[in-house]
């Protein structure tokens, strides 16, 4: 589905040169920003700097999904994502769907009957925030009007969400789910894509519009007089390059905090390790037409009495007997006769990293823990627990703010901008974030939601008060 390993960034730059804009980071955030500035607005002489090949540090470790289904407390995230999805759909049409955009949806499931009213309230809020109309099915007759998602593509699909509150209807439409599931929300303007293909599509267009790339690490940013004047890059050959510029964009992903410090800017960021596992579903348990399916309940893993006693006796494994967070999720990967299923459970979120560690710390139990947890969502997977299949595990970091909203816009240093803190939603947010960032840089009119993502929001007393009672962050 995706290209083979991308080629390293090109290396063709004098030791002292000038650029209109220097972008640090060739993940999806940096590439989308370069594309917006060069292709859409015609900005020339943009240099994209990264010590790794494009889209290889964290951008290629995601589940490659997108959604417009986000919590409040306002409509900023829904508005940002709706705009991103508009752009993704436009690019897909223009490229004959080169990056395989679909609209399978997100399927949120719960076995907690008491959650039904909360799901309805959340959906009503999402509707007012612009996520689309909500359709509620309380019996099988009402559910007869439900429209299934197509295997491929995104045209002619409903938006909004379908809410099932009748177990017989849930069994009819989602037969792989556990029989105790009592409510399901199928959010519809959601799906996934090939992130690698999207990144290469945008990067190729940006290069054709004049963006150049430099393989190296940003080692210093000169901000004499309170403004950006140059950027130093330690090149792949070990030589140091000075690029005179008045505009520097920090798209450094998990290293955004450290890169911000180079420019004298403090970014309130931390990172959480996230892993995902892939296996071949040779038993055909998961419907190949399924969306991204999430268990919205916390759970405790099932163990025999003997296993539980043994695990509880060791401080290193005691956590395996305790409740684990909601949000375990899976989706089928690939089309046609592909049998791959991706699974993710973000149970590492209690450990925060101020500085990310590479390579990632190993979690030797991850594959088994996720498979055991997934049985609560799809019981047909239980035979895989008894005989664990080969599972490929990789991962990266969710680098985020406390409220899990991105940083997009200027900083206190003139000419220094940030486009980071995209947590686990970088692929889906990058298009609209790049557009928003370009508006800041070029002095264009800003949409109302722009203020929700600027760094100076933390200087507003009303925002700090809102932050203290934030509620859900939408993290998966």
Q: Where are the model-predicted features located?
A:
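Beta1/beta-strand and adjacent pyrophosphate-binding region of the FAD-binding site
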Residues: 13-29, 47
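Dinucleotide-binding Rossmann-like beta1-alpha1 core, especially the glycine-rich loop
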Residues: 64-168, 325-328
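Helical element adjacent to the flavin cofactor pocket in flavoenzyme catalytic cores
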Residues: 178-180, 184-247, 251, 255
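Active-site lid/adjacent beta-loop-alpha segment flanking the redox-cofactor pocket in flavoenzymes
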Residues: 281-413
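Short beta-strand to alpha-helix junction loop
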Residues: 79-80, 109-116, 185-204, 213, ...
